[in-house]
């Protein structure tokens, strides 16, 4: 399978798995999978230089909080070892956790059995990802925090002479938050060009359409005013997403604004507009419509 087809396969698998879980659980963060599938698939198959997973294929039970717990580990091992020459990945909107778990399964970094542990008591495969959840490394339950934490990581890696890059996956809703802009200003001040952020710009927030809640546009120009290099791409074009990572940005952080559709690939969701943040079925036949869509598109696959 050529690289382009592999990336598209992973993206389709992400949507399929998250749709299946949404049907099984009676709801879920499905629109996030629709908008970000190509972004995460491209990062994991075309862009990031990661080593093989060093974490257990089936995620272990929650081992306790950090501190005196000698066995505590983050979920970073699913993204490979920490090595000077390797990239690192950080997810900021941790309500995308199931989307990330599906990505790890589709790319062979986590066993399919791990998904069966989703949102189970005593497990690490949480609905809202934490630093011990597969693929996660930071506590970012309050949106806007991850980028600030990555500043310290990126600065430390640069001072140690490490050549690996630091990728941050973000949502556009985070740009309604002041901490995000403070982080961007700091990244630019310290000339941290080893940081690349990919933004799922789906125009949605928990409270509705972003431009009706707290406008953030023109986002590209605002980011440039804060000292970043910013590029806009079609967030469902895997070639454009991959090429964006090669944009020259010496001495500056790079932000890839991926313009996306919150129902791409699961078009039956379009009728819910603008209620996309969390798909909770009503009594209007929504679940039955999604079940029919799933059967027609993916058959009996889970």
Language-model segments: residues:
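N-terminal capping segment at the start of a domain
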Residues: 11-27, 200-202
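Cofactor-binding active-site loop characterized by glycine-rich and histidine/acidic residues
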Residues: 34-189
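Glycine/aspartate-rich loop-and-adjacent alpha/beta segment that forms the canonical ThDP
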Residues: 64, 238, 244-302
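Generic beta-sheet signal
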Residues: 87-89, 164-168, 195, 250-260
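Short acidic, glycine/serine/threonine-rich loops at helix termini
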Residues: 101-103, 130, 179-181, 207-211, ...
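Conserved thiamine diphosphate
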Residues: 161-163, 211-244, 294-301
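A short alpha/beta connector and helix-capping loop motif
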Residues: 177-202, 255-259
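A short, conserved beta-to-alpha structural element at the edge of catalytic cores
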Residues: 190-215, 225-226, 232
């Amino acid at each position: 399978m050529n690289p382009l087809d592999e990336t598209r396969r992973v993206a389709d698998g992400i949507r399929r798995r998250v749709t299946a879980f949404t049907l099984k659980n009676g709801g879920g963060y499905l629109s996030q999978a629709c908008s970000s599938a190509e972004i995460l698939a491209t990062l994991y198959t075309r862009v990031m230089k990661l080593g093989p997973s060093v974490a257990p294929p089936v995620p272990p039970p929650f081992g306790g909080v950090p501190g005196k717990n000698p066995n505590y580990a983050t979920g970073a091992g699913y993204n490979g070892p920490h090595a000077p020459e390797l990239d690192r990945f950080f997810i900021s909107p941790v309500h995308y956790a199931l989307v990330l778990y599906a990505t790890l399964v589709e790319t062979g970094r986590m066993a399919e059995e791990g998904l069966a542990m989703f949102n189970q008591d005593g497990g690490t495969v949480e609905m809202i990802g934490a630093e011990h959840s597969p693929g996660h490394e930071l506590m970012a339950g309050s949106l806007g925090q991850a980028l600030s934490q990555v500043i310290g990581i990126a600065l430390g890696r640069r001072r140690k002479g490490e050549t690996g890059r630091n990728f941050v996956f973000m949502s556009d809703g985070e740009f309604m938050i002041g901490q995000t802009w403070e982080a961007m200003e700091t990244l630019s001040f310290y000339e941290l060009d080893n940081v690349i952020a990919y933004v799922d710009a789906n125009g949605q927030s928990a409270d509705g359409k972003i431009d009706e809640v707290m406008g953030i546009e023109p986002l590209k120009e605002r980011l440039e005013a804060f000292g970043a290099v910013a590029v806009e791409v079609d967030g469902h074009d895997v070639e454009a997403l991959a090429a964006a990572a090669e944009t020259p940005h010496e001495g500056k952080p790079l932000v890839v604004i991926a313009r996306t559709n919150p129902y791409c690939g699961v078009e039956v969701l379009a009728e819910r507009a603008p209620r996309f943040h969390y798909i909770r079925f009503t009594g209007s036949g929504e679940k039955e419509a999604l079940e029919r869509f799933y059967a027609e598109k993916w058959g009996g696959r889970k």
